[in-house]
Amino acid sequence: EDALVRPSIASGTHALYLTLSALLNHGDEVIAISGRPYDTMLTVLGQDGNEPGNLKESGVTYKEISLYNNDIDWESAIKEVTMKTKLLMIQRSTGYSFRPALTLAKIKNAIEKIREIYPNIYIMVDNCYGEFIEEIEPSDIGADVVVGSLIKNPGGGIALSGGYVAGKKFIIDRIANRLT
């Protein structure tokens, strides 16, 4: 429905922080359902170090669910959701883990199963390194918001900075307000 594509979004991590901080408030919970995210995301979430302005400092709690046989364990994800859970986070790439990247087929299956029980929960896909490798993108299979870096696939390693956020218009409007 809408997107922000900006060189002023310094990186993929910056785009992810903007997204999470725009959608999550004190008392909310985020669950990473594709295992441990990048180290930089752990800093953003307040799980590594104590950088000022991290989400834990803002009262956002965090849980993570490991992959099961290199796939999203959607059954465990559904069981872990509480009244506080506002957003489920999926990291498509391997990050620093030794595992295959998540395919859109696997992500779609998880989103469909989760939406059967929790139709209104936000689902965010960290799409860094995932752009342009399949005919569709995560927003085509039910993700509310897709986030990535312009430095990696879109920028071909040539762009020095930049990030993007694409998804539902009301979400992008909230993120744009946070950015400007």
Each PLM stretch: what is its role?
Residues 4-8:
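Short glycine-rich or small-residue beta-strand-to-loop segments that form or flank ligand, phosphate
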Residues 10-180:
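Conserved PLP-enzyme active-site core in the AAT-like
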